[in-house]
Amino acid sequence: FLSDATRQKITALRRKHRLHWPRAGTIDFGGFDRLTPVSQVFGYDRGLPIDRYYIEAFLQANTRDITGRCLELGDPGYITRFGQGVTRADVLHYVPGNPLATIVGDLTDAPHIPDNSFDCIIFTQTLQMIVDPRAALRTIHRILKPDGVALITSAGIAKIGRKLGRDDWGEYWHFTSQSLHLISAEIWGEANTTIGSYGNVMSACSFLQG
């Protein structure tokens, strides 16, 4: 409700008279007063990583959509856990060698996966690992049935999980809800795109620390 000039004046006065709250210099960072994270593996060594709490809450809220023929990346764990009336569970993996995989391929270029194949695709924490996310989303759209549902999650505030030269692939993007909405609505349309975000300042800090 305030003009830019008024806001700048108030900010200048707060700095001049040290009117910040909490007072500048009084915050106790406790166990976060460190330059390396508490856990190097997102907290898997200490329990359930915080992002998985939100991911699983999201899937739990959408169990009615995890039905019919479903596709998941890596393993069918979430299909098994949250699916209702699943008739077939397929697993996609990027490279050969995964014994659970029923389909091997790159979602940015996967002509061997037929159109209109799946009622539901669970696509968690992977979009940020794909150099061309729009191409991957176009494939997901193509291989979904006309009334199918894609349940997609991706990292916002998080440490980098994959590095080229150390892992098989890198991590290229961290999305905001706005950017993910933008590229999803380009493909599905505004009416068919629903975006939500999870977390707060404390959970973001804790997730970075593991």
Model-derived segments and spans:
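Class I SAM-dependent methyltransferase SAM/SAH-binding core
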Residues: R52-P111
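Acceptor-substrate binding/catalytic loop of class I
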Residues: R46, K163-I183
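Class I SAM-dependent methyltransferase Rossmann-like catalytic core
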Residues: R14-R64
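Acidic carboxylate diad motif detector
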Residues: I152-S154, A158
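A short SAM/SAH-binding and catalytic strip from SAM-dependent methyltransferases
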Residues: D119-D132
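Conserved catalytic loop of SAM-dependent methyltransferase domains
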Residues: A191-G210
